[in-house]
């Protein structure tokens, strides 16, 4: 059964159980909004008047991975120094890029490739933002997100802007005005984004001992009031608590309200307001074992939690936190939340398939969703599901170091967050980046994520309680992406395969990858070998292996042969590697070549085609 109570003891036993048949919340297969433009940090908003859904994402400049700062095609061709924007007029069945002449919006109103956000004012005007180095833009649309008639490419200097629509033609922009300082302020435009106030309302505090707090996350407006998440910061610079900042029109500054003391793993908490102005906050904690060190050199991570707390008085007081998600075998992180009618919320999060330091250790990342229709109850009922099933949307590490990730050649393709929202029916929409696809021409992995869109297809909506199985759009075949490549690549050592001298050992071979064939619902995936990895080890029965190192010497001790030291060969279809050796001791040796394809399928050793045994006497 997938119905679980929202207490820690009841929920720890099961993290992502299937919901019961009576409340079977289900989702569509991931739909690719675009097969060329980047999709990190995506958001959606529905326009009930123009019957459109607007989808926006980071353009990808600071999300590039493999090979570092190099901008491969098609990214370089499509670069516009603007956030990406699409609209759908058929409830998400198809998507169209906005703009003309190579721009997503008028460049005199929109500037900046990163940090998008969406909001709508009380007059129905939709706003977006982007950051270009240190300047935040605001631009807006009155036709459902298709064109942008108002805006300012330099509303104010700052970093990581968030928006909240106010009265007609009014929008608020929250941003960090100074790097390396708690400088969070909120600015205002009253003319659709054409002009912005230059004096902000602060929501940050630095204490004499260096501790403090800062506004940190998505901003919301309701009835002449603003509310946003805040993170509390200790004297060592780490997050040690979560809360909210609130403001009512005319106040000189925001007022901080702490929810609880806690560690944080993600960049910020997330909040949502339901139609009765109840406020919900979610965050991920970050327990670690300080007695152990992981492969990144940091403290060893432990299983963690997604927590939620509720306020019935617009953030002044908060309920005791409950656990929304937990697994003993992985990490849950980057939660987001959307609310509908009073007490009805959806929480989404990423989940790894193993305990890992995600900054440098690979894992398979999937999506989890918690559907809560009685969130105001003392013990809410949480129906959990996996919107993409066991399918991974990312198989790699997840760097959280911001712009330094690209410089250090770490994987930041997912950006810093993903989101859920509601369509015009009140059914849940999930927007995420996806790194599983490959270039249809070369078969190479994309250096950035692609935008995906997942729609609730069954179960109760968060508004009106309708069945989300009604009125579903039918996406096109091409939007569902490529077939899943489960076939491992093949490597063959070319005879004689091995050449050994007193100082060097050389291997050569060929490798190939079949990819997978298309179907009625999936596009084909071109096969591509990404790399060939080679290991050389002295083997001894019942003792294990001593692997050859870069120094040309063997490891000092025998250990499990399943943990090799690997060299990357030059070339892929035809490859070779020349390894230095220094005084190899006598004994039996084994050289193994393994190919890895663009879908991260890894070849296993065989005794015939990719393994050579030799002896040193």
PLM features per residue range, with description:
Residues 77, 300, 368, 412, ...:
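A generic structural micro-feature
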Residues 484-492, 504-506, 512-617:
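Long, low-complexity serine/threonine/glycine- and acidic-rich segments characteristic of extracellular
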């Amino acid at each position: 059964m997938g119905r679980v109570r929202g207490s820690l003891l009841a929920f720890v036993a099961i993290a992502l159980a299937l919901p019961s048949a009576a409340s079977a919340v289900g989702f569509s297969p991931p739909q690719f909004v675009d097969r060329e433009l980047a999709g990190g940090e995506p958001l959606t908003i529905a326009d009930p008047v123009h019957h459109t859904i607007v989808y926006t994402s980071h353009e990808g400049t600071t999300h590039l991975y493999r090979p570092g700062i190099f901008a491969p095609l098609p990214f370089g061709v499509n670069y516009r120094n603007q956030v990406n924007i699409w609209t759908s007029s058929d409830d998400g069945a198809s998507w169209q890029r906005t703009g003309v002449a190579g721009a997503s919006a008028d460049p005199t109103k929109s500037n900046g490739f990163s940090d998008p956000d969406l909001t709508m004012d009380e007059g129905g005007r939709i706003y977006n933002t982007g950051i270009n180095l240190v300047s935040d833009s605001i631009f807006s649309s009155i036709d459902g997100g298709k064109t942008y008639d108002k805006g300012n490419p330099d509303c104010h200097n700052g970093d990581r802007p968030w928006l909240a629509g106010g009265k007609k033609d009014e929008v608020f922009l929250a941003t960090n005005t100074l790097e390396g300082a708690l400088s969070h302020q909120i600015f205002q435009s009253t003319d659709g984004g054409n002009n912005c106030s230059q004096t902000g309302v602060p929501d940050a505090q630095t204490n004499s001992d260096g501790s403090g707090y800062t506004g940190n996350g998505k901003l919301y407006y309701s009835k002449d009031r603003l509310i946003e998440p805040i993170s509390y910061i200790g004297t060592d610079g780490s997050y040690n608590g979560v809360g909210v900042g609130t403001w009512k029109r005319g106040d000189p500054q925001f007022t901080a309200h702490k929810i609880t003391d806690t560690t944080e793993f993600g960049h910020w908490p997330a909040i949502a307001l339901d139609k009765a102005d109840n406020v919900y906050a979610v965050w991920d904690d970050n327990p670690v074992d300080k007695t152990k060190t992981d492969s990144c050199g940091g403290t060893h991570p432990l299983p963690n939690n997604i927590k939620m707390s509720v306020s019935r008085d617009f953030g002044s007081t908060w309920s005791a936190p409950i656990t929304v998600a937990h697994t003993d075998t992985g990490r849950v992180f980057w939660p987001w939340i959307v609310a509908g009618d009073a007490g009805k919320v959806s929480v989404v999060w990423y989940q790894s398939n193993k305990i890992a330091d995600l900054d440098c250790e690979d894992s398979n990342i999937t999506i989890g969703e918690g559907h809560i229709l009685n969130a105001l109850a003392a013990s809410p009922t949480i129906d959990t599901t996996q919107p993409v099933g066991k399918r991974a949307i990312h198989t790699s590490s997840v760097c959280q170091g911001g712009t330094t990730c690209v410089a250090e050649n770490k994987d930041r393709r997912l950006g810093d967050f993903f989101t859920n929202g509601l369509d015009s029916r009140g059914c849940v929409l999930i927007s995420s980046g996806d790194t599983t696809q490959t270039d249809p021409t070369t078969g190479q992995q994309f250096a950035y994520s692609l935008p995906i869109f997942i729609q609730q297809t069954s179960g109760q909506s968060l508004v009106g309680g309708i069945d989300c199985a009604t009125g579903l759009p039918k996406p096109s075949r091409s939007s569902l992406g490529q077939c899943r490549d489960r076939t491992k690549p093949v490597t063959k050592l070319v005879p004689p395969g091995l050449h050994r001298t007193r100082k060097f050992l050389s291997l050569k071979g060929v490798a190939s990858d079949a990819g997978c064939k298309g179907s009625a619902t999936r596009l084909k995936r071109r096969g591509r070998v990404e790399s060939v990895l080679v290991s050389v080890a002295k083997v001894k029965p019942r003792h294990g292996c001593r692997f050859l190192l870069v120094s040309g010497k063997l490891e000092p001790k025998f250990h499990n042969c399943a943990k090799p030291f690997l060299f990357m060969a030059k070339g892929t279809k035809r490859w070779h590697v020349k390894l230095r050796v220094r005084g190899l001791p006598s004994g039996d040796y084994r050289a193994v070549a393994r190919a890895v394809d663009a879908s991260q399928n890894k070849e296993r050793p065989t005794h015939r085609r990719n393994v050579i045994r030799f002896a040193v006497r």
